[in-house]
Amino acid sequence: MTEAVERLTKKSEDSSRWYLELVRMAKLADYGPVRGTFAIRPYGFAIWERIQADLDARFKATGHVNAYFPLLIPESYLTKEAEHVEGFAPECAWVTVGGDDELEERLAIRPTSESIICDFYRKWIHSYRDLPVLINQWCNVLRWEMVTRPFLRTAEFLWQEGHTVHATAEEAREEALRMLNVYRDCFYEVLAIPVLTGMKSPSERFAGAVETFTCEGLMGDGRALQAATSHDLGQNFARAFDITFLDENQERVHPYQTSWGFSTRTIGALILVHGDDRGLRLPPKLAPTQAVVVPIWRGKNKGEVRREAEALHRELAEAGLRAEADLDEEHSPGWKFNEHELRGVPVRVELGPKDIEKGQAVLVRRDTGEKEFVGRGAAARRLVELMDEIQQNMLRQAEAFRDENTRRAETYEEFKEIIEEKRGFVVAPWDGTEETEQRIKEETKATIRLLPFEREEGKDLVSGRPGKTAVFARAY
C-alpha cells in the first residue's frame, strides 16, 4: 500500500510558498518551457469551465453573442490609438518571420483585441440601425510579463473580452456599469468572493479608456487583487480607427465603445481567498467534484462496502450532484481524506461496515470540518441541501475577513502602520493628484485600488488638501 504523503506548507506560515505548492500538489497547473507560460491541468481547467459556463450564460442573458477575432495584430493597428500603444507595447510579443521570410510589418500576438476588433467594426457598422453591437470572445492573450506566478500573473492566459459599440455616451457608460455588475454577481454568487466595485484612478485606467471600473478582491494574505475590469472607451478608439455611422438625423458621427474582461487570474483569487492550511476549499458551484464517497473497508467486508459505495455514488449522481467514489485500493482512507481535502472537495462521504450496519453515512464538510451523521436513504437529499449551505457560508466567511481587514486611517502615520503591519484595505481621503498617489506608492507600496461610487469628503492625509474617499492596499 502506497502511503507517501507530501506535506503542504502551511498558509499561515508562508503564504507564497503555500500557494505555489498547492497549485502543483492539487494538479491545477504546471510550468511551461517558456518563461511565464503554464499548462492548466484538467482539474484546474474544470474549474475554469464552470466559471466560463456561468459567465457565458450571463452574457447571453444580457443580449451578447460570441465571436472570434484574429490572434495576430499588425503593428500599425496598435499604434493608431496613442495611449493604447504606449500602455501595451512594452508587453507585446512580436512575430517578425513567417516561414523563412522576414515580414514587412511586425505582428503582435494578441495582448488585448481592441485594435483588431475596431478594424472589423469599421467595416461592419454603417447606420444607427447596426447599433448596439454586443460581442464577446473567449480566447487566450499573451503579455510579456517579467515576474510571473501561476494564474495570478502569467505571460499567456485565458480570458473573455467583451467589445460593444453604442450610439450615445450614456448607453456606453450604462453598458460598462452593467457588465461590472455582471462580474460582481458572478463573484458573489459563484466564486463566493465579496469584491468591492468602483472606479480606477486616472493613472490606473486601461490604456485609451475614458473610465475604468473594477472589481477588487481582498486575498487571504491581506493583499488586493484586481479581479475583473470594465472600460468606458468613449470615442477614443472610434476616432482612431475611423468608425462612423449615420445617425437618425443622417449625420455621420463616431460611436461610443466599451470593453470588459475576466480571466483565469480568478482561479488564483479563488485559491487565495478560500484556501487554508490543508489546501483548497472550493465553493460547491465551482467544484469539479462536489462530494466524494470514501469507502472504509477491511479484509472480508471489502466487497460489501465497495458495492454500497458504488450504489451511493449512483444515487448522488442521480440527484444532480457532481460526485465520485474513491475506490482506489492503493491508499488508506486517511490518505484519501487528506487528498480530497487538498483538492477542496466540499463534502467527503465516509462509508464503513458500521455505517452500513446502522443504515447511515457520515458527511464531513470541507468549509468547517463538521461531521454529520445522516440516514442512508436521506444522504443524497441532505447533500443537495448542504451545497447551498456551504456556498453561503464560504461567502459569509470571506465577507467577515474582508470587513475585519478594512480600516479607516485618520493620519498618514496610521495609514503607513496599517499597510505595513496589518495590510488589508485602507480607506482614506485622496486629493485627486497623481503626485500624492505616487508618493504614497513609493513610500508604502500601496496603490489606489478603487474610488468608491459614493465618496465622502475629507482632508488628504499626505498633502492636507481637500480630498474624497479612496480605497488603498498593497496588491498582486
Swiss-Prot record:
<dbReference type="InterPro" id="IPR033721">
    <property type="entry name" value="ProRS_core_arch_euk"/>
</dbReference>
<comment type="subunit">
    <text>Homodimer.</text>
</comment>
<dbReference type="GO" id="GO:0005524">
    <property type="term" value="F:ATP binding"/>
</dbReference>
<dbReference type="InterPro" id="IPR036621">
    <property type="entry name" value="Anticodon-bd_dom_sf"/>
</dbReference>
<keyword id="KW-0963">Cytoplasm</keyword>
<protein>
    <recommendedName>
        <fullName>Proline--tRNA ligase</fullName>
        <ecNumber>6.1.1.15</ecNumber>
    </recommendedName>
</protein>
<dbReference type="GO" id="GO:0004827">
    <property type="term" value="F:proline-tRNA ligase activity"/>
</dbReference>
<dbReference type="InterPro" id="IPR016061">
    <property type="entry name" value="Pro-tRNA_ligase_II_C"/>
</dbReference>
<dbReference type="GO" id="GO:0006433">
    <property type="term" value="P:prolyl-tRNA aminoacylation"/>
</dbReference>
<dbReference type="GO" id="GO:0017101">
    <property type="term" value="C:aminoacyl-tRNA synthetase multienzyme complex"/>
</dbReference>
<dbReference type="InterPro" id="IPR004499">
    <property type="entry name" value="Pro-tRNA-ligase_IIa_arc-type"/>
</dbReference>
<dbReference type="Pfam" id="PF09180">
    <property type="entry name" value="ProRS-C_1"/>
</dbReference>
<dbReference type="Pfam" id="PF03129">
    <property type="entry name" value="HGTP_anticodon"/>
</dbReference>
<dbReference type="GO" id="GO:0005737">
    <property type="term" value="C:cytoplasm"/>
</dbReference>
<keyword id="KW-0030">Aminoacyl-tRNA synthetase</keyword>
<keyword id="KW-0547">Nucleotide-binding</keyword>
<dbReference type="InterPro" id="IPR004154">
    <property type="entry name" value="Anticodon-bd"/>
</dbReference>
<dbReference type="InterPro" id="IPR006195">
    <property type="entry name" value="aa-tRNA-synth_II"/>
</dbReference>
<keyword id="KW-0067">ATP-binding</keyword>
<dbReference type="InterPro" id="IPR002316">
    <property type="entry name" value="Pro-tRNA-ligase_IIa"/>
</dbReference>
<comment type="similarity">
    <text>Belongs to the class-II aminoacyl-tRNA synthetase family. ProS type 3 subfamily.</text>
</comment>
<dbReference type="InterPro" id="IPR017449">
    <property type="entry name" value="Pro-tRNA_synth_II"/>
</dbReference>
<dbReference type="Pfam" id="PF00587">
    <property type="entry name" value="tRNA-synt_2b"/>
</dbReference>
<dbReference type="InterPro" id="IPR002314">
    <property type="entry name" value="aa-tRNA-synt_IIb"/>
</dbReference>
<keyword id="KW-0648">Protein biosynthesis</keyword>
<keyword id="KW-0436">Ligase</keyword>
<dbReference type="InterPro" id="IPR045864">
    <property type="entry name" value="aa-tRNA-synth_II/BPL/LPL"/>
</dbReference>
<comment type="function">
    <text>Catalyzes the attachment of proline to tRNA(Pro) in a two-step reaction: proline is first activated by ATP to form Pro-AMP and then transferred to the acceptor end of tRNA(Pro).</text>
</comment>
